[in-house]
């Protein structure tokens, strides 16, 4: 009787373990499928991006025209430096893998926009503006820390001089 119970218990445990392993395999397969999804970027047609920017960041038409000009300048810049016929040493796409080339292209475009997209009307939406704002904030904190440090040092010295 005890042998049958132990046998049934072992069969039950092994079947539960197999079921758990199958569930784990299915979950990992779904996760791998989700990782393989790719996002298509609308490089040629920027109207959807402009509409989104206009809705979310309240860009004016003038700013969108400036963005189009910057996009064209960048396109010319990119083609000039990525031309196979030219002997220019700088190449954006050094690695041949598709993912790295897209990432390099995006980071290059963001750097280009950061350097060039700075106008008085678009100050609040500019990357440079946020960087300067953050630098100013850190500078203010540093100044407060220095003030506190020197004030404490001065108070310590005056206290020592009194004694």
Swiss-Prot record:
InterPro entries with a match to the protein in the record: DUF2532
Protein name stated in the entry: Uncharacterized protein RP458
Highest classification ranks of the organism: Bacteria, Pseudomonadati, Pseudomonadota, Alphaproteobacteria, Rickettsiales
């Amino acid at each position: 009787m005890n042998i049958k119970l132990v046998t049934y218990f072992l069969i039950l445990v092994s079947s539960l373990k197999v079921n758990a392993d199958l569930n784990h395999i299915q979950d990992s397969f779904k996760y791998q499928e989700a990782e393989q999804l790719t996002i298509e970027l609308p490089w040629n047609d920027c109207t959807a991006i402009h509409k989104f920017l206009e809705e979310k960041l309240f860009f004016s038409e003038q700013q969108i025209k400036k963005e189009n000009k910057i996009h064209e300048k960048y396109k010319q810049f990119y083609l000039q430096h990525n031309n196979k016929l030219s002997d220019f040493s700088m190449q954006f796409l050094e690695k041949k893998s598709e993912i790295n080339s897209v990432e390099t292209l995006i980071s290059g475009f963001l750097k280009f926009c950061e350097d060039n997209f700075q106008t008085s009307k678009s100050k609040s939406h500019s990357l440079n503006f946020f960087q300067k704002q953050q630098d100013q904030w850190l500078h203010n904190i540093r100044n407060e820390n220095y003030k506190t440090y020197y004030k404490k040092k001065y108070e310590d010295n005056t206290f020592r001089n009194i004694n």
